[in-house]
Amino acid sequence: MALDVLNDLNQIRNIGIMAHIDAGKTTTTERILFYTGKNYKIGETHDGASTMDFMAQEQERGITIQSAATTCFWNRQTHDEKQKFQINIIDTPGHVDFTAEVERSLRVLDGAVAVFDGKEGVEPQSETVWRQADKYGVPRICFINKMDKLGADFYYSVDTIKTKLGATPLVVQLPIGAENDFAGVVDLIRMKAYVWNDVSGDLGAHYDTTDIPADLQDKAEQYRSELLDQVAESDEELLEKYLESGELTEDEIRAGIRKLTINREAYPVLCGSAFKDKGVQPMLDAVVDYLPSPEDVPSIVGFDPQDESIEIDRKPTTDDPFSALVFKISTHPFYGKLVFVRVYSGSVKPGDTVLDSTKEKKERVGKIFQMHADKENPVDAAEAGNIYTFVGLKNVTTGDTLCDEKSPISLESMTFPDPVIEVAVEPKTKADQEKMSIALAKLSDEDPTFQVKTDEESGQTLISGMGELQLDIIVDRMRREFKVECNVGNPQVAYRETIRKAVMNQEYTHKKQTGGSGQFAKVLMNFEPLDTENGETYEFVNEVTGGHITKEFIPSIDAGVQEAMESGILAGFPVVGVKATVTDGQVHDVDSSEMAFKIAGSMCFKEAAPKAKPVILEPIMAVEVRTPEEYMGDVMGDINARRGSIQSMTDSTGVKVIDAKVPLSEMFGYIGDLRSKTQGRAMFTMQMDSYAEVPKNVSEEIIKAQRGE
């Protein structure tokens, strides 16, 4: 069935619900789905029955891991008429291990609802998600949730939006009562009160519009006056009228708020208690009143895949050629690979062929759905401005651009941090081995920050990701969804080795005579450190002249050296940063072979390496810590104790920002230590920066550990 409001982009909102963990965003989303008619029964996060948290782990842990996408409709009552709006919602995780899920959601949204805990106000992860939304230029409205909670303070929460986020709040509502007495909200635009009367079985679906309680009248007048001052300054005509008459109409106030919101000059603030079914409907009105439609955001800009210097822009209409961005992939038990896309321009139907310009491959679109959490609603076309799920695409990955074959475009892809933690996993039985390979391939397809590789020497499978919670959940999903039981090792650091001194004219002769055809290969080689900052490269040079080694054997020498480098020198870690030059050698007419020269290359390196001053390299992380000033001394002392070096200290809104470089091996458990040192008020991000030489005392410990001493 084709959905009935796809044609009018003004009536579509693509929004995200974003927050700190436990601020109540999944419950808020549940209420939205209930009041928009998508849900007949309200699911509670603490009961493990939430619609958006449809993975088993999410329902058990009460947190949101994957961004579920859903479509719902809201009838906005304006004056005497109702107008229907389509709202596409992405529910995003608030846990630090799942920042990739948040990043990719924000990349394709037009607006967002930032949910805050009414007692805590802005919390560390709220700041992280807010900064991510700033990065992608996403307009937001704020919903101060949990107003029924003990200690809830609306005015404190508004203040933290100013002080901690450096944002300008536009207070459009005031709470009526607080904690157990929270009963509703004052609408400062209409100057009316909305009161929920806790009718049994009503679940907050109906509320009364009344006069503002007498004890709030003065405060409402004061806050309305501040709101009108802010709104009037958004527009010269409004300012002129306001200065003349001292008043603005409801429509003018909403238009002014909308302009400020879309330009990200200010952020409307509303309040309620999603769990107690209060304040959600006016928040939905605010979503359609203030957040942008696909037409309000700038045209998407990409470039010509054949020539990156040529910019192309696509307007959000079906008249422009088809272009879309893949922002998520998940696995469905029946349909297989589900590809979530944001369509920016044009349209596509089931059965059409599109170009994946990122991979330069054609793909055929099978079915097209709009999702309601894990339920699929088929549609007969995917059109500009909307979010859909495609089935049938084979080789697509997150961040790919899909476009019209005849009008190719590449949209800016998404960047994800490199994994920072690695663990070994092994299947418990032989039968689990193949199932584990399939499971890991599918799971790494879904999450760009999760990677899988095999250790050549031990044959172990190593999985890496952004944190221990993420890897725990991967292992849990293998067990639940793919029925794979596996053992999991302890977290490990990805060390490397390199050489610091050149070894010239290293000779090696491989000779074997055991009846029948023998083996013979002689090489003369130089091994030098490569001048490379991150120690990641390898160079092979052939300087053999006079045909002393025939050309067919040269690649075998190269392969032998690389194979030996994989095995390490001191502690079995892969060697990087080596320039290998073969200068001379000797061939036997009968006994020389590719295998003989591969062995000669390998052994030549193995004999030279111990003389080349080998050292161990460790990954160094660029760490940014944002902390309130009072904890700065403790945080810096802790970084120094972890062999870290402080690079800079700067002021940000309400916090000190410390940039440091710290070895990854010292960062395990850091999040817990930082929380306890700062009472949970500091936050940090880290990403791979470079490799650096390990100090001698640490190197000795690593070598002993690798040898099992």
UniProtKB/Swiss-Prot annotation:
Q: Which PROSITE patterns match?
A: G_TR_1, G_TR_2
Q: Which UniProt keywords apply?
A: Cytoplasm, Elongation factor, GTP-binding, Nucleotide-binding, Protein biosynthesis
Q: Which InterPro entries match?
A: EFG_II, EFG_III, EFG_III/V, EFG_IV, EFG_V, EFG_V-like, EFTu-like_2, G_TR_CS
In terms of superkingdom, the source organism counts as Bacteria
Keyword Cytoplasm carried by entry: yes
What are the GO BP annotations of this UniProt entry?
A: ribosome disassembly
> What is the protein's given name?
Elongation factor G
Species name: Bifidobacterium adolescentis (strain ATCC 15703 / DSM 20083 / NCTC 11814 / E194a)
